[in-house]
């Protein structure tokens, strides 16, 4: 199922009810979970490489007019609320993988709206703070107007820091005791199709 699965919680609950009643095997298309670097970060978290997690800072900044340069960006789904657009729903992958990493969310604080001069009818900036039930705090920045684009994740723990930047596709760990960065994974030329293949393979296993 393409995300967002609905534009209202009422309809989400309806869909969930149908899925449960009909016993339909369902997967939402959040492909970033299947990115090799994101999977490596999850592995490092679970092995407690940096001890207990305290806080997280995630950023996804992009420039919407560059997404499909041969099209009018203002007419695309990402720019229109009626088509499920907006920076929060379109760039939902960050929220999804943090939920995958850390579980249920207890509190949400957010400032979200249209702040740039782009021709949009929806939100183009969201600053979000999450408190997970395990007391981990996450700061998330999403925007449609940033060049050069950035997608990064920094996770701070009691024994160090995990850092990933999509522009280099390197996952690094800072060891607090040794006061030094260590490369845990570096992909020279990442083929984005790989994560979609992994996503499909996972779904095929489920059915």
Residue ranges of each PLM-predicted region?
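Beta-strand-loop-alpha-helix segment that lines the small-molecule cofactor/substrate pocket
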Residues: 1-33, 48
């Amino acid at each position: 199922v393409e995300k967002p699965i609905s534009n209202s919680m009422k309809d989400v609950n309806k869909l969930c009810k149908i899925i449960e009643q009909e016993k339909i095997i369902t997967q939402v298309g959040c492909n970033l979970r299947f990115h090799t670097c994101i999977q490596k970060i999850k592995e490092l978290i679970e092995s407690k490489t940096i001890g207990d997690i305290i806080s997280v800072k995630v950023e996804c900044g992009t420039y919407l007019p560059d997404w499909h340069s041969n099209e009018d960006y203002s007419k695309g789904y990402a720019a229109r609320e009626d088509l499920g657009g907006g920076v929060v729903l379109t760039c939902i992958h960050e929220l999804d993988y943090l939920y995958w990493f850390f579980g249920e969310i207890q509190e949400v604080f957010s400032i979200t709206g249209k702040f740039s001069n782009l021709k949009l009818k929806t939100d183009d900036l969201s600053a979000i703070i999450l408190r997970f039930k395990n007391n981990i705090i996450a700061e998330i920045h999403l925007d449609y107007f940033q060049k050069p684009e950035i997608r990064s994740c920094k996770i701070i723990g009691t024994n160090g820091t995990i850092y990933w930047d999509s522009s280099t596709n390197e996952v690094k760990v800072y060891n607090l005791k040794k006061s030094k960065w260590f490369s845990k994974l570096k992909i020279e030329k990442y083929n984005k199709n790989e994560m979609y293949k992994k996503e499909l393979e996972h779904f095929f296993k489920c059915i």
